[in-house]
């Protein structure tokens, strides 16, 4: 069983003129996020970079909440396992660059890595799960595929 996973997810923009809210693009600005399963309950969160002073350090952290949801949806045997999350955020928060979309995609991709070790990430399945959480596929699709039309 895999006990740690790392992912790298890009910033995005879905505010593209006449394509506003119907197409999006990935940008060369990245959040790097990792998770390690712990032998004890709880969550430990270490964040550096953008938002390091403002993001929650508990289960309400968007990556952790999404990761937990993904673990349940993907049938991970211990969805309530203790977690150590590390994040190096380069995507500014609340600036229209998709930091929430990146957090959601990060959480789900981490869940995939833990729940389905050795199985190639199904990007279409990831999009379905991420869009259900985010509510706007134009925000999460480019974080998964690079460009979404």
Segments predicted by a language model, with ranges:
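ATP-binding N-lobe of GHMP and related small-molecule kinases
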Residues: 1-95, 113, 119
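Gly/Ser-rich oxyanion-binding loop with an adjacent helix/lid
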Residues: 77-149
């Amino acid at each position: 069983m895999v006990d740690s996973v790392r992912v790298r997810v890009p910033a995005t923009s879905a505010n593209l003129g006449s394509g506003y809210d119907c197409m999006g693009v990935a940008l060369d600005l990245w959040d790097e996020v990792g998770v390690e399963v712990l032998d004890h309950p709880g969550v430990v969160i270490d964040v550096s970079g953008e938002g390091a002073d403002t993001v929650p350090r508990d289960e309400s952290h968007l990556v952790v909440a999404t990761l937990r949801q993904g673990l349940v949806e993907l049938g991970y045997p211990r969805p309530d396992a203790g977690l150590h999350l590390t994040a190096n955020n380069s995507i500014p928060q609340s600036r229209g660059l998709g930091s929430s979309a990146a957090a959601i995609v990060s959480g789900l991709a981490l869940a995939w890595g833990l729940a389905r070790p050795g199985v190639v990430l199904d990007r279409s399945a990831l999009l379905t799960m991420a869009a259900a959480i985010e509510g706007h596929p134009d925000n999460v699709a480019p974080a998964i595929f690079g460009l979404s039309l």
